[in-house]
Amino acid sequence: MQYSFTEKKRIRKSFAKRPIVHQVPFLLATQLESFSTFLQADTSSTQRKPEGLQAAFTSVFPIVSHNGFARLEFVSYMLSPPAFNIKECQQRGLTYCSALRAKVRLVLLDKESPSKPVVKEVKEQEVYMGEIPLMTPTGSFVINGTERVIVSQLHRSPGVFFEHDKGKTHSSGKLLFSARIIPYRGSWLDFEFDPKDVLYFRVDRRRKMPVTILLKAIGLTPEQILANFFVFDNFTLMPEGAQMEFVPERLRGEVARFDITDRDGNVIVQKDKRINAKHIRDLDNAKTKFISVPEDYLLGRVLAKNVVDGDTGEVIANANDEITETVLEKLRESKIKDIQTLYTNDLDQGPYISSTLRIDETADKMAARIAIYRMMRPGEPPTEEAVEALFNRLFYSEDAYDLSKVGRMKFNRRVGRDEIVGPMTLQDDDILATIKILVELRNGKGEVDDIDHLGNRRVRCVGELAENQFRAGLVRVERAVKERLGQAESENLMPHDLINSKPISSAIREFFGSSQLSQFMDQTNPLSEITHKRRVSALGPGGLTRERAGFEVRDVHPTHYGRVCPIETPEGPNIGLINSLALYAHLNEYGFLETPYRKVVDSKVTDQIDYLSAIEEGRYVIAQANAAVAEDGSLTDELVSSREAGETLMVTPDRIQYMDVAPSQIVSVAASLIPFLEHDDANRALMGSNMQRQAVPCLRPEKAVVGTGIERTVAVDSGTTVQAFRGGVVDYVDAGRMVIRVNDDEAAAGETGVDIYNLIKYTRSNQNTNINQRPIVKVGDIVSRGDVLADGASTDLGELALGQNMLVAFMPWNGYNFEDSILISEKVVADDRYTSIHIEELNVVARDTKLGPEEITRDISNLAEVQLGRLDESGIVYIGAEVEAGDVLVGKVTPKGETQLTPEEKLLRAIFGEKASDVKDTSLRVPSGMSGTVIDVQVFTREGIQRDKRAQQIIDDELKRYRLDLNDQLRIVEGDAFQRLARMLDGKVANGGPKKLAKGTKIEQAYLQDLDHYHWFDIRLADEEAAAQLEAIKDSIEQKRHQFDLAFEEKRKKLTQGDELPPGVLKMVKVYLAVKRRLQPGDKMAGRHGNKGVVSKIVPIEDMPYMADGRPADVVLNPLGVPSRMNVGQVLEVHLGWAAKGLGWRIGEMLQRQAKIAELREFLTKIYNESGRAEELDSFTDDEIVELAKNLREGVPFATPVFDGATEEEMSRALDLAFPDDIAKNLGMTPSKNQVRLYDGRTGEMFERTVTVGYMHYLKLHHLVDDKMHARSTGPYSLVTQQPLGGKAQFGGQRFGEMEVWALEAYGASYVLQEMLTVKSDDVTGRTKVYENLVKGDHVIDAGMPESFNVLVKEIRSLGIDIDLDRN
């Protein structure tokens, strides 16, 4: 096995029993692939597939004018590079996007041309079509400076669906069948039976009409309709009775209404006997062709065709008429011999279409279409053209109706056709086929569809959602262009005069900015980012709504297996509607979810991997990943547990066709991070996977000692870490930048082989957590492509590290862990284990008001010197200042209107001048409850406004930093190029050169070192190829210099141009505060198994329970939290974590006593290779073994993959290896080594029972008490009720509700109650009086009338009751 540079530093010991047969795919692939398909930016315009933007353009263009003499054709489109990079967009609050330009061609035809159209003029031009937001390399979008994610939508696939109402509609419980044809866009067509078995149709859920109206409208006559749905019985009328053609299976099961005889007159079936199989056989044997029937047998039957008198041409009876005695008489009079009737019975041939035809009053095709027109457009007079146009537009027009590729495929498959391609509009035979299947369902043949089957639900990804929006915008443009095309020739217009890009821009902007599926990215930690991008929602436009979604839609379905995670979904109203993709799931070309399986041939597992969708999967027998497999790949068990069509069964190996690729295949990323998931109850696992997403990144991330082996994949795929683009040697490292000198074989010829990585330092995430990258390589390290070079937030040596490993003891402690409370040692806080940094962004804007512009300044009256001391001369706080709540960050004054002055004020003005009173202080202050350090300030100034000193200084600093960066890059690039040159020139023969280099001399290193580097290029070489190479390197350096100069100029231009600010804003200042949050009582914490709680007390280290060797516990948890919750995984994690730490301590002890490398190797081999997946430690050098051992001192990380984890024996073996008997005795461990004797820290006495102790990875969640604690003295009041507002955001008060009032009443505290309900709430006059009294030093309350009483009076008056307050 190949280990990467980072993996070698710390190997995770895996207990997996199965080899890796299929790597976990790139976790963000769905988003990135979908959007790149939408843009097709890197494909040349001629080779673009009809997908995404290309499809939208080609579906709307060409646009033809109303008179047909002008048309606008689409040629191609191109995307220009974005004006600002991602970081600049985030800083300036811009959208990271690219301008879309389309090349269109205006073709004008000659109106005078008599016969065929002749092209008179062609104008081609590039037209601006708006801006398209671009996806960042990590799958998000930057919209107005914030990162957003477009969530994929799970919606009903287009196609045809058959269902019944489960007997809920009608009181009798009768099943009413219905069918629905759903197009991708266009009108829905529904067919439904009513309780009387009449078949109706409706368009777009409007009024229902008999289905035969639709059949007539598509051109069928009643005869054709009946011929399509029924088989006919043939009768020949005889002078006495009639003869019926004998069809055996039609008679079976019926009761004979007369004696049935054979040709010789022998009675085979007696009257009133049921006809059975033997009777049919006898009739067959007698070679019966016809049966004589009495005349009354015909009565009540229905004619299948119109009956016409052969002589006169008169219609005697119509198709679908019932045969009565009158009709029979007429038939005999007209000498009609042969008639056909419909064959129906009560079991499997109902008369439904015939009954429907009977209630249908329309006569012919036109009448039927008029009826449909009246239903669609009630009140409008139907003209023939309008009627035809509406009907054709409903289902037959490509503009208005699109079944889509998926819809056509699903439709054809459902109606049993072989080919899966066809027209995208509805055809007549499609409607007929649908009705036929529906009638067959009513007749008891076939099955209804399961709507929740993942073969009937498909995923719309970013690309598709964006394409739909773009098309909607284009269609709006098309309408406008059609209007103007008529004038194109007369006014000599160009294409850009015709096209207005506003509708497209607004459609795209609305979608990315405010659509339900465009969400503010959850950026708490790398896992929450990745999960958000892999989320699949059933809500959103065109999807379900929370209120209407029933239990079935939300429930886990057998087809979710390997496609959608059965565990991870939110608790609350969205449960089951928002899901997560499973680990290996993947979208196919139609948008259906697929999952990989290994092919099994003749009971042998092969290496072939096939992706199957839910529809295909139903046809195979699939074994689970944990089926026993021999060395040669054959299945060894006699019976293998497998799945077929959603059912679990035990089958013999020869029936198995596929096998799962991995046990973790069925769960999502978050669930696959929970060790021992198989031992947790599903409800708790759900909480565990949701809470991992809320873990706040700690100051020093620490890897989980017990993991599942997928941590590295998550960290790398999330994009939080920095990966090497190309391999090479680390040349330079500091906290903010790394430089790698690329390997010769990876650097393209003539190119400078240097990669420079600038790290993200202390940046604010969407959730105000801190994003910071730290290098994990040192100068001289050799790295290869894809290696992790720097850790990001919540990653440790390239692995996800959401929390900290805590020494946990399960025991009660003085009631402080009652009801899931958590007891924490002071040492945890002192060591900053759970300290996190949060970055708050505070904004202030200076606007242009009616009374004059607001000003950002240091010159503010009534401000203490302490406050002013933090501001620079521009009135903006210094970086590095430590600020508390209420401190001024940016000084700002606003002009205020002239007010009526009191005599005292006039006097003051006369003495002290005007300035102070005509402005009011509106400075930006630190909000209540917040304190921290200023880490960054940004000043944005509108174009044309003079920049202040601070803004100019920020620009200068930025340019200086950029110039240094470029100089460093150039130095490294040149150094690298000259190193390569020295290697190349060494020993080459020269034709001459500087310092009188003679022709034919061999160049030596000493000569080169004496020479100035730039003179090396003056050496003339004999070898032409080498000379060309020398020239190429010289050109490349010159080019790089030129490139850097251009880049610097570009940067300067960007920084010095004015900023785009909202209208009316002159200046904007953003101040970033870093807030340090230590762990404190009230913070929420959790493990990974749904074991959550709130910190109740932080206990001094000397009071914590401790072991025999004096080691105190970090966390004390309540043991009662485990049995009822059934999340036993946490207990197993604690045991394995204990073993992991113990092994680390033993390795640390070996390193301390400088044990021999051989001993170290032997011990590591025992750890890694005695069970589970073996590691190739022999391939490591001694230095690498020592480095590995050093990184293992704090615990050997274990991986216990989901559903394939460590067994009890393996855990016991690990514990025995970690704690030999002598060590175990010193620690006071029990003989089984899974519990420890603990001592009470306060009394020093041993606790009565042994306690389960070990290491658990514990997280601090983003529900911090600092963000929730809030107090108010005075603040804003509600406008109508005059009561204080509620909530921290409004700086509101505490609600004194109904039950609190009861409590005070119960105590008889009448004065307190009066105070609460009046002056502390909504008694306006009373409030001011209290203030006046306090100023006077008189602590008296004058309670008056609460404002809510007046509100009540007004409310009653608004109901028309005259009520007035008697104030006497």
Curated annotation (Swiss-Prot):
Catalytic activity: RNA(n) + a ribonucleoside 5'-triphosphate = RNA(n+1) + diphosphate
Statement: the UniProt record of this protein carries the keyword Transit peptide: no
Keywords carried by this UniProt record: DNA-directed RNA polymerase, Nucleotidyltransferase, Transcription, Transferase
SUPFAM superfamilies: beta and beta-prime subunits of DNA dependent RNA-polymerase (SSF64484)
One Gene Ontology cellular component annotation held by this UniProt entry: DNA-directed RNA polymerase complex
GO molecular function, one term: DNA-directed RNA polymerase activity
Keyword Metal-binding attached: no
Main EC class the enzyme belongs to: transferase
GO biological process terms on file: DNA-templated transcription
EC number per UniProt: 2.7.7.6
PANTHER family xref list: DNA-DIRECTED RNA POLYMERASE I SUBUNIT 2 (PTHR20856)
Recorded family membership: Belongs to the RNA polymerase beta chain family.
Known role: DNA-dependent RNA polymerase catalyzes the transcription of DNA into RNA using the four ribonucleoside triphosphates as substrates.
Quaternary structure (record): The RNAP catalytic core consists of 2 alpha, 1 beta, 1 beta' and 1 omega subunit. When a sigma factor is associated with the core the holoenzyme is formed, which can initiate transcription.
Protein name per the record: DNA-directed RNA polymerase subunit beta
Organism encoding this protein: Paraburkholderia phytofirmans (strain DSM 17436 / LMG 22146 / PsJN) (Burkholderia phytofirmans)
